[in-house]
Swiss-Prot record:
DEAD-box RNA helicase involved in RNA degradation. Has RNA-dependent ATPase activity and unwinds double-stranded RNA. A motif (Q motif) lies at residues 8-36. A motif (DEAD box) lies at residues 165-168. Pfam families: DEAD (PF00270), Helicase_C (PF00271). Residues 242-392 form the Helicase C-terminal domain. GO terms for cellular component: cytosol. InterPro entries: DEAD/DEAH_box_helicase_dom, DEAD_box_RNA_helicase, Helicase_ATP-bd, Helicase_C-like, P-loop_NTPase, RNA-helicase_DEAD-box_CS, RNA_helicase_ATP-dep_RhlB, RNA_helicase_DEAD_Q_motif. This is ATP-dependent RNA helicase RhlB. Its EC number is 3.6.4.13. It is found in: Cytoplasm. CDD domains: DEADc (cd00268), SF2_C_DEAD (cd18787). Component of the RNA degradosome, which is a multiprotein complex involved in RNA processing and mRNA degradation. The keyword Aminoacyl-tRNA synthetase does not apply.
Length: 397
């Protein structure tokens, strides 16, 4: 890979050959800004705090750092099967599964074993993987990890590197007491490397970082470039009663094949999905109420194009990395401007063009000024063409 001005190559970090081989297989030529920033510190063993949204390459940043550390340092001569050397804690099941998939891709030429613990999946099945081989990298949600830890199946006293991903989301979801319990089981902060990532640096997040890290390097990637220029943003002013008609007609008139629809509440997500299915659209839903095995099946179906419309809440939609999503529709505007950036970041990934369409009704249009302030620009409100507001003709079997 030729040197290019202003860009850092993975090659420049002198990584282990088996790791470089995996990076080349994935077709990553140059580091993203967060990768270049974080790796410059973490490969020297320093703690780091990174501010970056999903879609910036932060997952690969911390995984490359972990894998390099574990391949360069031999494992302890004696350890239990359930004593991971690296621990990654993330708030949602989808995010854990995605991180583990990326970790499997990056470790394929090494002897490192990656394991996942998530709630909603068979406890015994997860226990069997622990009993079968040593665990090098453990990716887990806080609750399920605590279950294993309290039952004495997992010991965290040999953790060399700990990563807390989406710390702001963990705060929002009330996971911090569980995370504290977990961290108490790991070596003292001066004896392990700690990396913390968050989409926002609130006072609460920085307080946690201070408690859990030692003299960390701070890497901030401006989030504005995540609402990327290749996502065309539209806002339709539409009455709440007309939102479903507009959604249905947009999808079916245009023949869109891979669409993500976001709503703020689980009951809204369920209602939208049920109506779409009733009206003959191949749709599925993702929310905290959907059992894990079904969520994984749903994501696979969406990735493979069997599911046309995926309706999700913000928490469930976080960390979904599926290329080829052509449109994101905000059925309701999010209450937190950061969530708007996250939502529209599901489309226009990997340099592709994408379109986001937001429905602003009487109940949620007041969120617009804060979203525009976050984006640093105005988005003009359009009136939808009348043919897109026509009544939905009920399907007859």
């Amino acid at each position: 890979m030729e040197p290019q001005e202003g860009k850092t190559r993975f090659h420049d970090f002198n990584l282990a050959p088996e790791l470089m081989h995996a990076i080349q297989d994935l077709g990553f030529p140059y580091c993203t800004p967060i990768q270049a920033g974080v790796l410059g510190f973490t490969l020297k063993g320093k703690d780091a705090i990174g501010r970056a949204q999903t879609g910036t390459g932060k997952t690969a940043a911390f995984l490359i750092s972990i894998i390099e550390q574990l391949t360069q340092t031999p494992p302890p001569a004696e350890r239990y099967m359930g004593e991971p050397r690296a621990l990654i804690i993330a708030p949602t099941r989808e995010l854990v599964v995605q991180i583990a998939k990326d970790a499997a891709d990056l470790t394929k030429y090494t002897n490192l074993n990656v394991m996942t613990f998530v709630g909603g999946m068979d406890f015994d099945k997860q226990l069997k993987q622990l009993e079968a081989r040593h665990c090098d990298i453990l990716v887990a949600t806080p609750g399920r990890l605590l279950d294993f830890n309290q039952r004495g199946e997992v010991h965290l006293d040999m953790v060399e590197v700990m990563v807390l991903d989406e710390a702001d989301r963990m705060l929002d979801m009330g996971f911090i007491p569980q995370v504290r319990q977990i961290i108490r089981q790991t070596p003292h902060k001066g004896e392990r490397q700690t990396l913390l990532f968050s989409a926002t640096f609130t006072e609460d997040v920085m307080n946690l970082a201070k408690q859990w890290t030692t003299d960390p390097s701070i890497v901030e990637i401006e989030s504005l470039n995540v609402a990327s220029d290749n996502v065309e943003q539209h806002i339709y002013a539409v009455a709440g009663a007309d939102k479903y008609k507009l959604l249905y007609n947009l999808v079916t008139d245009n023949g869109w094949e891979r669409v993500m629809v976001f709503a703020n509440r689980k009951d809204e997500v369920r209602r939208i999905e049920e109506r779409l299915v009733r009206d003959g659209v191949n749709a599925a839903q993702l929310s905290g109420d959907v059992p894990q095995h079904k969520r994984i099946k749903t994501l696979e179906g969406f990735r493979e194009g069997k599911i046309r419309v995926l309706v999700a809440t913000d928490v469930a939609g976080r960390g979904i990395h599926i290329d080829g999503i052509s449109h994101v529709i905000n059925f309701t505007l999010p209450e937190v401007p950061d969530d708007y950036v996250h939502r529209i970041g599901r489309t226009g990934r990997a340099g592709a063009d994408g379109v986001s369409i937001s429905f602003a009704g009487e109940d949620d249009s007041y969120q617009l000024p804060a979203i525009e302030e976050k984006l640093g620009r105005k988005i003009s409100c359009e009136t939808p063409p009348t043919h897109l507001l026509r009544a939905v003709v009920r399907q007859t079997n």
